[in-house]
Every structure is written in C-alpha cells, then in structure tokens.
Swiss-Prot record:
Cofactor(s) annotated in UniProt: Mg(2+); Mn(2+)
EC number: 4.1.3.24, 4.1.3.25
Subunit structure as annotated in this protein's UniProt entry: Homohexamer. Dimer of trimers.
Name of this protein: L-malyl-CoA/beta-methylmalyl-CoA lyase
Function noted in UniProt: Involved in the ethylmalonyl-CoA pathway for acetate assimilation. Catalyzes the reversible condensation of glyoxylate and acetyl-CoA to L-malyl-CoA and the reversible condensation of glyoxylate and propionyl-CoA to yield beta-methylmalyl-CoA. It is also able to catalyze the cleavage of (S)-citramalyl-CoA to yield acetyl-CoA and pyruvate, although this reaction is not involved in the ethylmalonyl-CoA pathway.
Disulfide bonds listed in the record: none
Co-factor binding comment: Divalent cations such as magnesium or manganese.
C-alpha cells in the first residue's frame, strides 16, 4: 500500500539557528542571551584547522558552564572527510554532559554518512551511561546529498532537522555564482520586457522539504550571506516559509530578529486560520464538506492548512 501516515516533526520552535565560531568564546554569552531558538556552536568552516582543538575545548567549557536557558543547543562538527570529526564526537559526548542537545553533521552525501556518526555516538552513549539521546541535524550541501536526500532523511531515528548549505551546494553543482543564498542577478525570468529575479535554491529547498515532511523532520533554510541586506534576508526567508521550511540560519546577530519575524505566524494569519476552522466547524454541523470564507472556497484540506498555522503559533507562544 502506498499510503502511510505522515509522522509529525519534533514539536519545538526552530525559527532561527544562530551560528558562532568555537574559536571566539567571547561571543558565547551573547548567543545564550539572544532570541534564537537554536544555538549552533561551530567547529567546522568558521574555525581554522590550527584552532580546531582549542575551539572544541572552548565549546565544551561553555556547554558545561553557561546558562543556555531554553535554547536548543547544537554543535556543528567537522565533516567526515576530515581528521577532526571523530575527536569532535568523542570529546563532546564524553565531556560536555547532558546539556548538549544535538550535533550538526555537515556535507552529508548519503545515509551511510549518518550511520557512521550514529554508530560512534551510540557506542559512547552506552559506555558513558548517557540517558538523554543526542539528536542530529544534517546539512545537504552537495550534488550527492540532494540526489540521496530521501534516504538521508530516513537514515536515523536521531535525525530531527535538515538544512541546505547554499555555498558548498553551489560549488558542488557547478553553479556560476559566488552568492550565499538569495536571488542571483543572472537567474531571472522575462516578463513584459522586465527582469524578475528568482533564486536557484528553491528546487533543492522543495526536495528537502518533501523528504523532511515524509519522515517527520524539521526542514530548515541555510545561510543568507549578505548580512547588510535585511530585505533580501526577509525575502529569502518568506520564500522558504512558503515552501514549508520552519526556520533559517543566522550568521550575524542582526538576522535573529528577522528570522523570528518571518517564521512566527502573524496575528492576522492566526486569526484567519482560526476563522477558517470555525467556518468549517459550522459547515460540518450543517452536513456540508465545504463553505465560503471571505469569498473563497474552503474545504477539508483547508482545515489541515489552517491547523499548521495555529499549531505553529501555539508552540512558539508556549
């Protein structure tokens, strides 16, 4: 049978994931005090090779020593193609304690990549008697990753989220751009003699969303590199939200408020969703499967759409 129930994703806010390099511990307290739902302390791209060991020590000290409040606390480890990743996993699991919620696995190209990390994590958890299972977020940032996105989404019960890493993805795909997310000047459509810029990421985002929703995982948009362009960030985030993504990375503190703004349902949207649910309740009481709301048809499928908005708003306000 082709039909199966679609599992629900983790019920936690994930509007903004704020990144900070492990080599800059002075930033950690500010990150902990930010309005981001998720904190990603980074051991990968933002840390120079010679600084990896010290960055790892900085992060472990901060996880154990700082008050992170209700933040979902994550560490991006180094890629499996480096000599650093296993030490990242071993030291974090053995030294960081239960406050660590998640590790982010970069450059995942197939399910076996996730399995390799899962096997190591599971062995350490058993050896240490860790009772809180560590969750995973993976980053799709290669042609192989997007080609195998569904098998990756199904690869581990630890997997809670999946992001698109735009820069490495663009390089792997041979895309002619140096931009990180957002619209690209040479990627446009012609309409009435004018250019209407689009972005080359939406098809990959849609593939990630479909795989995530099939397997009960949170789909997350990746970085927007130009942190001087607030409107560009908002526009990219709105497109991602429309596709079904639940949040976006922030690579600069000023992007946190922008992400929270876009991925928090507005009062108008929530009110309209509740009104649609009420209208459909009234229709069902009359024995009808559809009704008219503000001049447009709403039916049973509209209930599901409205419930998505209401659930998201209630989860954020809880």
């Amino acid at each position: 049978m082709s039909f199966r129930l679609q599992p629900a994703p983790p019920a936690r806010p994930n509007r903004c994931q704020l990144f900070g390099p492990g080599s800059r511990p002075a930033l950690f307290e500010k990150m902990a005090a930010s309005a981001a739902d998720v904190i990603n302390l980074d051991l990968e791209d933002s840390v120079a090779p010679d600084d990896k060991a010290q960055a790892r020590a900085n992060i472990i000290e901060a996880i154990n020593g700082l008050d992170w409040g209700r933040k979902y606390l994550s560490v991006r480890i180094n890629g499996l193609d480096t000599p650093f990743w296993y030490r990242d996993v071993v030291d974090l699991l053995e030294q960081a304690g239960d406050r660590l919620d998640q590790i982010m696995i970069p450059k995942v190209g197939c399910a076996a990549d996730v399995y390799a990390v899962d096997a190591l994590v599971t062995a350490i958890e058993r050896a240490k008697g860790r009772t809180k299972p560590l969750s995973f977020e993976v980053i799709i940032e290669s042609a192989a990753g997007i080609a195998h996105v569904e098998e990756i989404a199904a690869s581990s019960p630890r997997l809670q989220a999946m992001s698109l890493g735009a820069a490495d993805f663009a390089a792997s795909m041979g895309m002619q751009t140096t931009g990180i997310g957002g619209t690209q000047e040479n990627y446009y459509m012609l309409h009435d003699g004018q250019k209407h810029w689009s972005d080359p990421w939406h098809w990959a985002q849609a593939a990630i969303v479909a795989a995530c929703r099939t397997h009960g995982i949170l789909p997350v948009d990746g970085p927007f590199g130009d942190f001087s362009d607030d409107e560009g960030f908002r526009a990219q985030a709105r497109r991602s939200a429309t596709l079904g993504m639940v949040g976006k990375w922030a690579i600069h503190p000023k992007q946190v408020a922008l992400a929270n703004e876009v991925f928090t349902p507005s009062e108008t949207a929530v009110t309209e969703a509740r009104e649609i649910l009420a209208a459909m309740d009234a229709a069902k009481a009359r024995g009808e499967g559809a009704t008219v709301y503000k001049g447009r048809l709403v039916d049973i499928a509209s209930i599901k759409q409205a419930e998505v908005i209401v659930r998201q708003a209630e989860m954020i306000s809880a």
